[in-house]
């Protein structure tokens, strides 16, 4: 074993500090004022070759490959004072103290709050199996969130978690570990200081986290990280807010890609349709027609791999980049028909090739595969339908060949979206199988997680190389840190059960906390018997808030999960999906916010209400953006839904029932009566929620003609509505529309609209729904001119411009033609003594 007991002098070298211990050299970088890198070089190999990082201050052998995604920065300013017993490195916001004997590293913020402390003796170790271990001090009231895609409760305190992604079909949503993703990042939230700090362990090797599950009398309470290979390479990310940690983590690993609008619509799917013996193309077109007949909006179809199940010497086998022409007679015509219907198709592509694949010999000649650990031949593993070999994406020439296969096999027919599936490389039992690793050489065991990221990068590049103005849309089941740069992901092949409905929420929230805003689960469950009627309705009612909303199944009872599968329930299904579409201006704006800031769309309660410790274990209720609290029903047969409304610490901030507009103070649990139609939601003070006033059935083709905005102006607030064409890259050249809304609350409430960008404002009508329970306005003005007042709702609805106070909703309804320029609405709630006049 190798253990760091004590350290000697600390020196500065170019852009890092070197700490020489009695076991290994440790290097420390102030990457930014808030991000510190601590790397213990057990192998003495300081070569940089990261696929994860989008921000660096050093050269890396992946710089050329990631040149469109990586930002080079200068290290932040810091000063070193080296003493006999302790060295202190001070930056502008963080202070590092290096205690020399016994050795440990501590990090403090500018207020003197301890953010991180190593455990002496245990901090930087290599065990007898060559695994590297880092151990950190924790407290009994610390909470831990993130870790990528994990099941169970959202708070992982006292949990042990493995990070070895695999094909976990039908997983137990409470207990199964690992799932499909490898994102070794978590957020520690202190229950005493309410401050957050992020830990990103920069590794692609299999690893595990012990978050205080074990205790030892000789040391302070601790957590530990253990990796099968590579250095201890920790990026410590200061907050103090959770949002700041996530924003800085996504500075480090990349912001979410801005997806086309279709990616946020209902994505139809099923293993059933592409597996029909013939005419699958017609069956899928009929499915789209049926959704329209049923009045259900739809934007996409996730095409399972049956389309490429072709005849081989061993029978029908799935072979990526081929087409079964009995099932899909003319792929080009079919893609064109789907596009005419406003449907984006995402064909399934896999990185493994069966030994009977018709292109196998061509791929072998191009030397595209992972090599056996001993033999000079591609490494073999179990695959769909037989033995397969696996593509090595860490080789530049392989990447170029792969893009050509994508173009020739899919994109030339009209494909603009790719579903990268089964890319965990789970069936490669030989973890010592060799990969190229940009010429450095490594093993598949150390680099499995990056393959999915690279696949998604390549599918995006192939689409834009074929047509530079198409906005790519990649879907992926697996993923490593940084997958958010490329793809929308989902929680794999979940089990159809009530627990999956409930615990998949925490899984999605955890992914958002891990920088992956575009996540979801298979609504209705993927594997198992078909969902019972109540479960299916509740799942859709919850699913419409997920960034990715897809109903997908491979039911074991030979059924197909579809919106109309229960005639007595389809009205509730339709209503829920239409709610999502009506809120698409809000959802797309949150998507844009994630693209710019890294912040999640679905936010856990404790992220928005970080000072209320009563929210710290909440993994079912969540905030959609900052304005809307969603408390879906996830228990079978529920008639009452208990909802905790957080303590905001501000008496002016309250919550309003979305439907009744009943008002509630924070810091209390309320009981909400529910039935099968219920989707409990609460509007938070300061809310600005843009919605479509007209019906939308397809996000790619239907415009928002009337913009309806819900507001709760108890406090000052702001929000940016974002819009563009939703399908091209023209937004990069200024063809977008930002509507910055700012609200100044008070007796005179001012609502200012400021516009930026050249994209056409499609909304012809503006309608404001301004909650104000106390009283109706004295008057309303638009740019200084009084707006007509109506006492009768019918007359208000018939007018082009006017205002009306709804006694039912206790809100001011203001309607006017959209000026399509900067303007201001003034609503006066001033005291007016009519009798005194």
How would you name each of these model-derived features?
Residues 578-597, 658-738:
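Catalytic cores of secreted or luminal carbohydrate-active enzymes
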Residues 1, 113-677:
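Catalytic-domain carbohydrate-binding cleft regions of carbohydrate-active enzymes
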Residues 366-367, 373-374, 684, 808-812:
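Short alpha-helix boundary/capping motifs
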């Amino acid at each position: 074993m190798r253990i760091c007991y004590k350290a000697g002098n600390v020196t500065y070298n170019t852009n890092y500090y070197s700490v020489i211990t009695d076991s290994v050299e440790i290097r420390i970088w102030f990457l930014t004022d808030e991000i510190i890198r601590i790397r213990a070089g057990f192998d003495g190999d300081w070569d940089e070759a990261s696929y994860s990082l989008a921000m660096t201050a050093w050269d890396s052998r992946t710089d050329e490959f990631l040149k469109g995604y990586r930002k080079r920065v200068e290290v932040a300013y810091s000063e070193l004072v080296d003493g006999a017993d302790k060295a202190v490195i001070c930056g502008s916001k963080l202070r590092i103290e290096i205690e020399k004997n016994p050795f440990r590293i501590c990090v403090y913020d500018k207020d003197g709050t301890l953010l991180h402390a190593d455990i002496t003796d245990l901090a930087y170790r290599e065990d007898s199996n060559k695994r590297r271990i880092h151990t950190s001090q924790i407290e009994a009231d610390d909470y831990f969130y993130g870790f990528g895609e994990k099941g169970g409760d959202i708070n992982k305190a006292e949990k042990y978690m493995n990070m070895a992604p695999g094909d976990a079909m039908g997983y137990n949503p409470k207990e199964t570990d690992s799932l499909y993703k490898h994102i070794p990042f978590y957020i520690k939230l202190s229950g005493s200081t309410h401050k957050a700090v992020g830990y990103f362990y920069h590794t692609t090797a299999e690893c595990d986290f012990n978050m205080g599950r074990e205790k030892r009398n000789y040391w302070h309470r601790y957590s530990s990280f253990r990796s099968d290979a590579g250095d201890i390479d920790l990026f410590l990310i200061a907050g103090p807010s959770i949002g700041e940690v996530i924003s800085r983590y996504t500075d480090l690993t990349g912001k979410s890609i801005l997806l086309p609008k279709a990616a946020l619509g209902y994505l139809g799917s099923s293993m059933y349709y592409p597996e029909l013996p013939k005419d699958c193309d017609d069956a899928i077109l009929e499915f789209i027609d049926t959704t329209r007949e049923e009045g259900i909006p739809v934007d996409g179809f996730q095409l399972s791999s049956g389309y490429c199940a072709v005849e081989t010497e061993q029978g029908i086998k799935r072979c990526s980049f081929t087409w079964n022409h009995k099932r899909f007679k003319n792929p080009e015509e079919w893609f064109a028909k789907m596009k005419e219907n406003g449907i984006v198709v995402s064909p399934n592509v896999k990185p493994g090739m069966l030994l009977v694949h018709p292109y196998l010999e061509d791929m072998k000649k191009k030397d595209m595969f992972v090599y056996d650990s001993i033999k000079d031949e591609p490494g073999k593993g179990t695959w769909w339908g037989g033995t397969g070999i696996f593509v090595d994406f860490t080789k530049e020439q392989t990447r170029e060949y792969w893009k050509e296969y994508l173009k020739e096999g899919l994109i030339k027919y009209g494909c603009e979206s790719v579903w990268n599936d089964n890319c965990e490389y789970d069936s490669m039992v030989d973890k010592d199988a060799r990969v190229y690793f940009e010429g450095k050489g490594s093993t598949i065991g150390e680099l499995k997680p990056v393959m999915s990221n690279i696949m998604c990068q390549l599918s995006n590049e192939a689409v834009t190389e074929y047509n530079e103005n198409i906005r790519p849309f990649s879907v992926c089941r697996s993923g490593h840190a940084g997958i958010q740069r490329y793809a929308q992901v989902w929680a794999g092949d979940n089990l159809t059960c009530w627990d999956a409905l409930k615990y998949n929420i925490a899984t999605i929230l955890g992914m958002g906390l891990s920088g992956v805003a575009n996540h979801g689960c298979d609504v209705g469950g993927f594997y198992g018997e078909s969902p019972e009627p109540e479960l299916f309705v509740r799942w859709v009612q919850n699913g419409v808030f997920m960034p990715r909303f897809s109903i997908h199944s491979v039911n074991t009872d030979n059924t197909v999960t579809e919106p109309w599968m229960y005639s007595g329930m389809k009205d509730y299904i339709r209503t829920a999906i239409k709610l999502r579409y009506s809120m698409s201006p809000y959802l797309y704006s949150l998507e844009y916010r994630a693209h710019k800031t890294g912040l999640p769309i679905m936010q856990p309660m404790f992220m928005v209400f970080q000072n209320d410790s009563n929210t710290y274990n909440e993994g079912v209720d969540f905030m959609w953006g900052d304005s809307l609290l969603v408390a879906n029903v996830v228990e079978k047969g529920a008639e009452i839904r208990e909802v905790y409304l957080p303590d905001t610490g501000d008496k002016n901030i309250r919550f309003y029932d979305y439907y009744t507009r009943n008002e509630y103070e924070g810091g209390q649990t309320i009981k909400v009566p529910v039935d099968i139609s219920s989707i409990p939601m609460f509007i938070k003070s300061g809310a600005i929620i843009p919605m479509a006033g007209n019906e939308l059935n397809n996000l790619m083709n239907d415009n928002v003609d009337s913009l309806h905005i819900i507001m709760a102006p108890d406090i000052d607030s702001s929000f940016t509505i974002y819009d563009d064409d939703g399908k091209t890259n023209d937004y990069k050249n200024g063809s977008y529309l930002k509507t910055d809304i700012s609200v100044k609350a008070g007796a005179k409430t001012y609502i200012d609209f400021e516009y930026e960008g050249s994209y056409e404002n499609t909304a012809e009508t503006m309608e404001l729904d301004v909650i104000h329970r106390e009283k109706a306005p004295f008057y309303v003005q638009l740019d200084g001119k009084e707006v007509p007042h109506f006492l009768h709702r019918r007359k208000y609805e018939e007018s082009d411009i006017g205002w009306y106070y709804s006694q039912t909703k206790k809100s001011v309804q203001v309607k006017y033609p959209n000026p399509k320029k900067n303007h201001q609405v003034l609503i006066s709630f001033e005291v007016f003594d009519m009798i005194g006049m």
